[in-house]
Amino acid sequence: MKAIVRQSYLDKIAKYLGKDTIIIIVGQRRVGKSYTLRLFRDKVAEDIRANIIFIDKEKHEFGDIQTDRDLNAYIDERRDKTKTNYILVDEVQDIEGFENSIRGYYEEPDIEIIVTGSSSNMLSGDLANKIGGRYKEIFVQALSYEEFMEFHELPDSDDTLAKYIQFGGLPGLKKIGLDEQDAREYQTDVYSTVLLKDVIKRNNIRNVPFLENLAHFLADNAGKIISANSIAKYMRSQGENITSTAIINYAKYLCESYMIHKVNRYDIHGRKIFESNDKFYFEDNGIRNSLVGGSRERDIEKVIENIIYNHLVRLGYEVMVGQLQAGEIDFVCTKAKGERIYVQASYIIADDNTYEREFGNLRAIKDNYPKYVISMTPLVTKSDDNGITHLHLRRFLTNGLER
């Protein structure tokens, strides 16, 4: 099988090498972190000045490496001080006290450290305090639409986009194939693995049925503004008496696994971030679809919004939900140096009411930052409507944000 290189991630790794920096590759399980690490390993192996120390905690052969002492012993036995030693550890959070090892090695002149992890809290507490800002995170996402086409050898077409909307972007589907039942079984397996290893075990979850109900609720309500109180009310209607505090904690645990992302609301006029009532999106829309029983036509707006959110993050934006006095802006996106854009996500602009909701809300923002509507409206590829750029979803996913 032809190896497919996700070059942008390898370029990011190369950018941080040789700078006394720990490189941490993060993201949900099965989105390609391990694959990226192995591609880097294979590339470095071509250099005779490199000594590679590779540990994959998901492989049985590394099962004896349980603690930082085990890790130190393994590294010391294989270290060659006459070369550059690349310490590569996959799923490093599965080693108890790993932060002690990282702290001990990262300033050594002959060592580069690159690790992967599936929990956003792996750098919390002790390690973050010890190393300060001496680390760089590289966030690996599920496949983009363009990567999906490359992985599955498909052309850029409406049919391929429909497949991407339905199946999502887990790289493992290349081997599984795009049969609906096989794909759903694989997505369900990935979901179960994330839930067990990165949520339940890591946080000692006892109320597993509620956790699963919460994940399904967030899948069914992706892209909707949600509060802990509204979830508690729904759960009570299902016979579960859960406190708002428990809901907040369980939602946080799900987000720490990178499977789900919480997006804050931003008051566009008041220029402040609200502390409640957020939106949630899934890292992979295929997993989201599998949790609600498959790709449903009535969910198309939610899935499109989910896809647009993930691609905006891929383009390097920090994304929030915009709040106006008389409406909502799906995404307020910012970058460094004050760059900002506003984006509305829609399925099809088919009538005046939909047009006014999407375009009218953008016109209510009285500033000169770029404004976009992204939809699947037929015959639209790119158009301008009084300064608002209307892009077809396919064009956005292949060309980015054009003016």
Q: What function would you assign to each model-found segment?
A:
Residues 4-17:
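Pre-Walker A adenine-sensing motif
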Residues 25:
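Hydrophobic anchor at the beta1->P-loop junction of P-loop NTPases
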Residues 53-83:
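Short glycine-rich substrate-engagement loop in P-loop NTPases that contacts/grips substrate
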Residues 112-118, 139:
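Structural recognition of the conserved hydrophobic beta-strand(s) that form the central parallel beta-sheet
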Residues 180-339:
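Accessory nucleic acid-recognition modules appended to NTPase machines
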Residues 378-403:
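Domain-level recognition of nuclease-like catalytic cores that cleave nucleotide substrates
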